[in-house]
């Protein structure tokens, strides 16, 4: 899915804009289409070093690709920081109607229950590494 959208984005990229602004580029795409498109956006940024501004309500997408995040609420700038820093403020984000990535929320809840997990876990791989370090050889949490 998303061939027309990818073709449209490719047409814009061919013009080599200094700043590429994408508004909800993954909306309505199936998971595979979303993964392909996000990978292409990341690759474009790495190769050309151009600025990419991604507007999205999908915090999972933002967590996967963004270096920095601007959070707006009612036309006001609420936060501007590195991705891990913004998502470590999950409760503040929830107050303005934004959700952190699901895995970040789970890790935040573990932290609030007293488990020694760091803030800013954004991916399943990071969470697995963190949780496995909490387990003993028998698979029990200390």
Where are these regions (language model features)?
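A short, proline-enriched helix->beta-strand linker immediately N-terminal to the Walker B motif
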Residues: 14-18
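Catalytic Walker B motif of ABC-type/P-loop ATPase nucleotide-binding domains
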Residues: 20-23
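Helix N-cap at the start of a conserved alpha-helix in ABC-type nucleotide-binding domains
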Residues: 31-33
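Helical segment within the ABC ATPase nucleotide-binding domain
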Residues: 35-47
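H-loop/switch region of ABC-family ATPase nucleotide-binding domains
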Residues: 56-57
């Amino acid at each position: 899915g998303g061939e027309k959208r990818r073709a449209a984005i490719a047409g814009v990229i061919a013009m080599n804009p200094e700043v590429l602004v994408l508004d909800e580029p993954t909306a309505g795409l199936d998971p595979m289409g979303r993964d392909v498109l996000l990978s292409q956006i990341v690759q474009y940024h790495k190769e050309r070093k151009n600025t990419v501004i991604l507007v999205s309500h999908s915090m999972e997408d933002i967590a996967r690709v963004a270096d920095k995040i601007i959070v707006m609420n009612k036309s006001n700038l609420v936060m501007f920081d590195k991705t891990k820093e913004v998502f470590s403020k999950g409760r503040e984000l929830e107050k303005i109607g934004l959700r952190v990535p699901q895995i970040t929320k789970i890790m935040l809840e573990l932290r609030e229950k007293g488990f020694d997990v760091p803030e800013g876990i954004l991916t399943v791989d990071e969470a697995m590494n963190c949780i496995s370090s909490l387990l003993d050889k028998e698979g029990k949490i200390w």
